[in-house]
From Swiss-Prot:
Membrane topology, Virion surface segments: 20-404
SUPFAM superfamilies xrefs: SGNH hydrolase (SSF52266), Viral protein domain (SSF49818)
Gene (name only): HE
Signal sequence, renumbered to the chain: 1-19
Protein's name according to its UniProt entry: Hemagglutinin-esterase
Organism: Murine coronavirus (strain A59)
Length: 428
């Protein structure tokens, strides 16, 4: 307790008030040491080449000093979600203890992707949120992320079908198997085997058309079907699956049918994909998770366009405690030197924390020092400070004992110096 009644306690009160407001949490992404990694897009892609006369690297929100750090995996125009599902693929690969994500905007409502002409982009926004929630959760537990291909064995004659695409994107994960020619309709069970190996854990999509699917022109029966998809782990006997439940279709009068995906974290093993009705789907790509670590939340920077283009908040929805800390700015994204969507001053400030280490990373932000702060670090990791809160009506300081001990040592040294000087001058 600090009360203003004696010189020594007055000194303690002054020290407490000096502490008040000190070592505030910074709104940045940073790291505790050099064991970190960033996944990004054009705003952190140092390899992007353009010929429009702009200064070199002016599109970056990342500080160019980090371009040769070896701690960045980024691709202009891409994202983890986009590469996971579509033919527009970039082989994101990286490893670190403290993982940062600054990507996701390259699949947003402004693209308006739908599998079918009368589909629903909102369903894809839900897919995006579920995908990133799984990735963030798992990367708080694993050091390494990469992509791997998944091969399958199918006993029929039908070939993969490309039924989910628009003008710019073509889905290739999951793979859909066409109807067998010897069946008049899609009312039959089909299956294929696939194996997951070489990683500690895998993120794979389990997807189905949630609603009433109408057969293609090759379906002479011209019936509606209810999708049913599942994966069965043949090694341990566990079944993962779901059936379509929505009362929507794929016509102008009955719109809304689109692909709904769940993102499963599966262990290595032998699996069977089973469809009880309509198209069989199975994974063609997976995110490979490798090297478990002590739990360390990921840091996610809001990935959005400037206000002239529609964005979404799916990465924010996916970033939940305790496995994820979300960082954002209070202003609209406003590009500076390059265009409206690149080079925002505030986001550059937010990412500037990657230039240096901090002592503590917490929900509120990053703390530079590990002694005291006016804020208690919530969900703190690293060497975190203790809070010192002062009440103005009745000065009370709640403090970490260590700084007070150090203060006592310093006061003791000061007293010894004063005594020494007094003796010195007195003798003189």
């Amino acid at each position: 307790m600090c009360i203003a009644m004696a010189p020594r306690t007055l000194l303690l009160l002054i020290x407490c008030q000096l502490v008040f407001g000190f070592n505030e949490p910074l709104n940045i992404v940073s790291h505790l040491n050099d064991d970190w990694f960033l996944f990004g897009d054009s705003r952190s892609d140092c390899t992007y080449v353009e010929n429009n006369g702009h200064p070199k690297l002016d599109w970056l929100d990342l500080d160019p000093k980090l371009c040769n750090s070896g701690k960045i995996s980024a691709k202009s125009g891409n994202s983890l979600f986009r590469s996971f599902h579509f033919t527009d693929f970039y082989n994101y690969t990286g490893e670190g203890d403290q993982i940062v994500f600054y990507e996701g905007v390259n699949f947003s409502p402004s693209h308006g992707f739908k599998c079918l002409a009368h589909g629903d982009n909102k369903r894809w926004m839900g897919n995006k949120a579920r995908f990133y929630a799984r990735v963030y959760e798992k990367m708080a537990q694993y050091r390494s992320l990469s992509f791997v291909n998944v091969s399958y064995a199918y006993g029929g004659n039908a070939k993969p079908a490309s039924i989910c695409k628009d003008n710019t994107l073509t889905l290739n994960n999951p793979t859909f198997i066409s109807k067998e020619s010897n069946y008049v309709d899609y009312y039959y069970e089909s299956e294929a085997n696939f194996t997951l190996e070489g990683c500690d854990e895998f993120i794979v999509p389990l997807c189905g058309f949630n609603g009433h699917s109408k057969g293609s022109s090759s379906d002479a029966a011209n019936k509606y079907y209810t999708d049913s998809q599942s994966y069965y782990n043949m090694d341990i006997g566990v079944l993962y699956g779901f059936n379509s439940t929505l009362d929507v279709g794929n016509t102008a009068k009955d719109p809304g049918l689109d692909l709904t995906c769940r993102y499963l974290a599966l262990t290595p093993g032998n699996y069977k994909a089973v469809s009880l009705e309509y198209l069989l789907s199975l994974p063609s790509k997976a995110i490979c998770l490798h090297k478990t670590k002590r739990f360390m939340p990921v840091q996610v920077v809001d990935s959005r366009w400037s206000s002239i283009r529609q964005s979404d908040n799916m990465t924010a929805a996916a970033c939940q405690l305790p496995y994820c800390f979300f960082r954002n700015t209070s202003a609209n994204y406003s590009g500076g030197t390059h265009d409206a969507h690149h080079g925002d001053f505030h986001f550059r400030q937010l990412l500037s924390g990657l230039l240096y280490n901090v002592s503590c990373i917490a929900q509120q932000g990053a703390f530079l020092y590990n002694n005291v702060s006016s804020s208690w670090p919530a969900y703190g990791y690293g060497h975190c400070p203790t809070a010192a809160n002062i009440g103005y009506m009745a000065p009370v300081c709640i403090y970490d004992p260590l700084p007070v001990i150090l203060l006592g040592v310093l006061l003791g040294i000061a007293v010894l110096i004063i005594v020494f000087l007094n003796v010195l001058f007195y003798d003189g």
